[in-house]
Every structure is written in structure tokens, then in C-alpha cells.
């Protein structure tokens, strides 16, 4: 039996079944079919709305990730450059002691250029100056110093500068903190 014959037979069987049904029964049967199709349409609509919401959430997440990559993608580069900056600062401190003005001037210029370049990318130093209130979100306490010369819980000395990339902490300032006796 081919496809056309099967379809014709199915239609004939359905016609026989509906011919045997009263008009009220046919109405009930049609209402049931309509309700089933309406439920299927509602389910499909809900599925479409969920898929749209998923797509919108994906777009937002992708946009956020792209923005973070643009803002913080240089993090590893900056982390590699910071020790160079530290060594330049140490060289400046020791060169002043030896009185080598030309060397000091050259290192100062290099230091300034490096700081300017880092600022262009949103890198700035954390305030770890003497007298600044200790903040564990930005400072790492390396030592506590008992002293009455400084207010309690303030920075006495900065061992290594901390840095921020935009608003994100790259590394904390390493400091000693005052503790009143």
C-alpha cells in the first residue's frame, strides 16, 4: 500500500468515526483538539521567550567579558613591569647617597617615563605614605611597630609600593603599622 492509499484510508476511518459521533461529541472532540493545540502553542511561546532571554543574557555576558578583557587584559604585563619600577626606585634611593648626579638624573627620567606609561593604562600607586591609615584592602602589614610618635593603626613605613589597575588591586603595599604602647 502506498502513501496516498494510507492517507485516504486514515481519512476514511476518521470520517467513519466522526459519522458515528453525535454533533455534541464531535464538538467536545474538536474542543479537546483545540485545547491541545493551544497548550502546544503556549509551550512553544514560553520556549521562545526563554530562548530570547538566554540569548540576551549571553550578549550581556559577552559584552561584560569583552569590557573586562579590554580593561584588565594587560594585567600580566603590568605585573612583570612593576619589579622594574621597584628596582628603579631603589636605585634612585642609593644613587643619591653616592652623589652621582648624572646617573640619578637618568634613572629619574626613566622612572618618570615608566610611571607615565603605566598611568596611560590605568595603573596607579596605592597610598602607603607614612601616617596614612592602614587599610587591609590595599595594604599588607609586614610588621607592627610600637610607637607613640604615630597614631594607632597608621602606616609607619612603606617597604614596597602597591598598585591598582583601574580600580582593581594588582598588589598591596607592604608596610609596617603603628601600634601604641
UniProtKB/Swiss-Prot annotation:
It is found in: Cytoplasm. GO terms for molecular function: adenyl-nucleotide exchange factor activity; protein homodimerization activity; protein-folding chaperone binding; unfolded protein binding. Residues 8-21 have a biased composition (Low complexity). The keyword Chaperone applies. Its main location: cytoplasm. Pfam families: GrpE. Residues 1-21 are annotated as: Disordered. Keywords: Chaperone, Cytoplasm, Stress response. One of its GO terms (cellular component) is cytosol. It comes from the Bacteria. GO terms for biological process: protein folding. Participates actively in the response to hyperosmotic and heat shock by preventing the aggregation of stress-denatured proteins, in association with DnaK and GrpE. It is the nucleotide exchange factor for DnaK and may function as a thermosensor. Unfolded proteins bind initially to DnaJ; upon interaction with the DnaJ-bound protein, DnaK hydrolyzes its bound ATP, resulting in the formation of a stable complex. GrpE releases ADP from DnaK; ATP binding to DnaK triggers the release of the substrate protein, thus completing the reaction cycle. Homodimer. Belongs to the GrpE family. This is Protein GrpE. It comes from Trichlorobacter lovleyi (strain ATCC BAA-1151 / DSM 17278 / SZ).
Amino acid at each position: 500500500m502506498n502513501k496516498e492509499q494510507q492517507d485516504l484510508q486514515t481519512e476514511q476511518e476518521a470520517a467513519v468515526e466522526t459519522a458515528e459521533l453525535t454533533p455534541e461529541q464531535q464538538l467536545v472532540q474538536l474542543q479537546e483538539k483545540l485545547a491541545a493545540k493551544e497548550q502546544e502553542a503556549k509551550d512553544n511561546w514560553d520556549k521562545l521567550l526563554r530562548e530570547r532571554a538566554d540569548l540576551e543574557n549571553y550578549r550581556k555576558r559577552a559584552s561584560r567579558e569583552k569590557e573586562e578583557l579590554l580593561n584588565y587584559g594587560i594585567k600580566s604585563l603590568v605585573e612583570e613591569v612593576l619589579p622594574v619600577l621597584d628596582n628603579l626606585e631603589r636605585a634612585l634611593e642609593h644613587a643619591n647617597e653616592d652623589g652621582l648626579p648624572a646617573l640619578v638624573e637618568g634613572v629619574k627620567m626613566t622612572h618618570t617615563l615608566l610611571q607615565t606609561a603605566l598611568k596611560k593604562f590605568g595603573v596607579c600607586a596605592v597610598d602607603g605614605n607614612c601616617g596614612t591609615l592602614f587599610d587591609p584592602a590595599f595594604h599588607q602589614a609586614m610588621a607592627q611597630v610600637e610607637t607613640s610618635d604615630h597614631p594607632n593603626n597608621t602606616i609607619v613605613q612603606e617597604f614596597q609600593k602597591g598598585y591598582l589597575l583601574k580600580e582593581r588591586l594588582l598588589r598591596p603595599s607592604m608596610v609596617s603599622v603603628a601600634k601604641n604602647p
